[in-house]
């Protein structure tokens, strides 16, 4: 069917999020044509999407091309959007609670203030997306969020850990390299093996978060709250661990990798 994603695209996305083969997401980008209609054109209008949502409580929007649409304020709760194309779409203030966003392409999209509580973002491509102030409480995230803006976002109880059960293509985990998580609420989040190289975590709430084996090289945690956070074997090479709140109550901070090479006050 015209406009539907070829299997090679899905495979390329999965390959971009695994270890150890792919640590550079640009490798995945080079394997697909991002200027093709699949990635740039929409097959529906906002009005058609809204009508479908009104007519069916849980419509199937999987693999739909919604690129560039303004879908702000719409309610996609529990809707199946698996494999949909939402590049450069505007979703500000929209609701995606419990929605399936697995394998979604949402490059440079705007989700500011959107609610994605309990949503599934497995193998999703959110690179460069704006998720500032979004609510991802208890969401499952294992995708590419490199350079994404998550400042002030709510990720309390979210699961960003590596998928240790399905490793046929390698280690699937959230990739947040150079992402902006300034002031984000990550309390109680599971970030075991999550990759956050050079991420901005200044002022973030990491209390009771699981950071075991996380990659935090070059990350800025200035002023972050780390009470009860588990740093066992997290790589903190060149990370800024300055003015941490609750550092004495953090777990296994002394067991973090390359702690002697971190920037500390």
What are these regions (language model features)?
Residues 1, 19, 56-57:
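Short, flexible coil/linker elements and helix-boundary hinge sites characteristic
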